[in-house]
Amino acid sequence: MKKVIFSVFVGVFVLACGDQSNHIGKPIETQNAISVKEGLKQFHASNKSEEVVIYGKVADVCQTEGCWFAYELSDSTLTVDFNNEFTVPKNIRRKDMYAVGHFFKDTVESSEKDSINLSKSKITVKFRAHGVKFK
């Protein structure tokens, strides 16, 4: 009887360790993925918000909850958020990652107290991911 219980325990343990998924959120098909730079280029050219799979290297990640990360670009970064659908590990900086979702324009109001700048706002492009996959 002890052998049977032990065998069942070992079997369950092996099965639990076997399927370590490398994605979070919506599953991603990576064969049609484009670089972050190419995705931004296409978004600026069409101004359409279509679902796309992008990939790149993570430059930064939220160290509080893992609620956003930023892709490296040559002269800046692209912020990726998840609309509270999931979070990512906090130790993914410098790792390559895929994301499925869409680009969008976000208006950031000026936080300066100067009355000249109060009416000014800055439009930035961000990416809203529905799933991510680690390379």
Residue ranges of model-derived segments:
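Sec-dependent bacterial lipoprotein signal peptides
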Residues: 1-15
